[in-house]
């Protein structure tokens, strides 16, 4: 993704209530937006494709959620899962909406259930620690976390009918070193907004929240 690819997302966030100075500052300070990617060769992989490395056969498990194309790798004989950023043990993976009205959170939750069906003894995440619990207990915890988040977002919408996503994001609880929403670093506001939208859109899919497009192009939300 190059820098120009981020401009439509900024305009989308603006329609969801993020002030222009905030999303532009987020764009300027986001390391991922600083690099223009050149062309390179790729080898597309699909669910249940296999890779052969070091005498092991790794099965590809497509697990959209953290990103649309996220993939875990599984070695059935070893009961070993390379979980990437799909399952992390000491933080919750960031689940952001990637397009207006999508259901990335719904896809993530479905992907967790997909992993639950595997026979796994060892889980190796992309970063941070492996934790002190098995992957199935961690899946339970991640699902409970997002259920709690959905309830929090729905409660905010019920108490603030016609709220926009940016204002709602500022009313959510965040585990970050900042005294208030106004003190959040611009880059963190960007990620927080994406995560809030993922939960809002999930509630829309569930029929608990309604999305309204105003005449001026901005979007607000109502509890159903």
Where are these regions (language model features)?
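Active-site HxH/HxHxD metal-binding segment of metal-dependent hydrolases
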Residues: 1-52
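Metallo-beta-lactamase
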Residues: 22-42, 57-152
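Short acidic/glycine-enriched loop/turn segments that link adjacent beta-strands
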Residues: 45, 67-68, 216-218
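Short, acidic/polar N-cap/turn motifs at the starts of alpha helices
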Residues: 47-50, 70, 208
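Short polar/acidic secondary-structure junctions
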Residues: 50, 64-65, 214
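Conserved hydrophobic "DFG−1" position in protein kinase catalytic cores
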Residues: 53, 73-75, 211, 223
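C-terminal regulatory/interaction regions
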Residues: 155-224
């Amino acid at each position: 993704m190059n820098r120009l690819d981020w401009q439509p997302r900024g305009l989308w966030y603006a329609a969801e209530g993020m002030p222009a100075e905030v999303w532009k500052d987020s764009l300027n300070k986001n390391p991922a937006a600083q690099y223009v990617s050149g062309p390179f060769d790729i080898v597309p992989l699909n669910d249940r494709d296999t890779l052969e490395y070091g005498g092991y056969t790794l099965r590809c498990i497509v697990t959209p959620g953290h990103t649309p194309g996220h993939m875990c790798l599984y070695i059935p004989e070893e009961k070993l899962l390379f979980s990437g950023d799909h399952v992390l043990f000491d933080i919750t993976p960031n689940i952001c909406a990637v397009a207006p009205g999508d259901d990335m959170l719904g896809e993530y939750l479905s992907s967790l259930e997909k992993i639950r069906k595997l026979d796994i003894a060892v889980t190796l995440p992309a970063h941070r620690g492996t934790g002190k619990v098995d992957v199935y207990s961690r899946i339970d915890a991640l699902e409970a976390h997002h259920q709690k988040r959905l309830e929090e977002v729905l409660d905010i919408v019920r108490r603030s009918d016609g709220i926009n996503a940016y204002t709602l994001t500022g009313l959510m609880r965040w585990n970050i070193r900042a005294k208030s929403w106004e003190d959040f670093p611009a880059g963190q506001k960007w990620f927080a907004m994406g995560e809030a939208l993922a939960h809002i859109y999930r509630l829309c899919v569930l029929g608990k929240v309604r999305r309204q497009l105003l005449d001026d192009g901005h979007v607000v939300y109502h509890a159903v």
